[in-house]
């Protein structure tokens, strides 16, 4: 089974890739290297004994996302970690964040709709906004 990990060379993504490979999945990493390093591939290989397939793709480019799924037709799941998360930068440059966090998600989902058997896991931003009035935080807040 082919599993795609977007943002797969980032901290959380690379650890996820290691775990997936360790249990036998064929992992395809998509990363645009804007906040990661190609050197992480070597680290994954040292840990697991196998380097994942790597595609340097900017998910904001719809045609690139379409071409990826045309090339890899056996994908059965996507774990989506590719997103921007810096609050200050998002206020200074909101359009970049809309493109990276929303448009790229939409392009992925449009392609996955063509594969009803595929599963999708979305990892939301690690940044939490606001101050909690009460702890623990309830599901209803």
Model-identified regions with their sequence ranges:
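N-terminal Rossmann-like NAD(P)+-binding domain of SDR-like oxidoreductases, especially those catalyzing
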Residues: 1-141
């Amino acid at each position: 089974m082919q599993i795609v990990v977007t943002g797969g060379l980032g901290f959380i993504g690379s650890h996820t890739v290691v775990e997936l490979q360790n249990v036998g999945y064929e992992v395809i990493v998509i990363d645009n290297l804007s906040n990661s390093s190609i050197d992480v591939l070597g680290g994954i290989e040292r840990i697991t004994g196998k380097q994942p397939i790597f595609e340097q793709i900017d998910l904001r480019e719809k045609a690139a996302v379409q071409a990826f799924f045309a090339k890899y037709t056996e994908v059965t799941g996507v774990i989506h970690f590719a997103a921007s998360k810096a609050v200050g930068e998002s206020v200074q440059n909101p359009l970049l964040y809309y493109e990276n966090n929303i448009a790229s998600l939409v392009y992925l989902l449009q392609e996955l709709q063509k594969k009803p058997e595929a599963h999708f896991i979305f990892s939301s931003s690690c940044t939490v906004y606001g101050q909690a009035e009460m702890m623990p935080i309830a599901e209803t807040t």
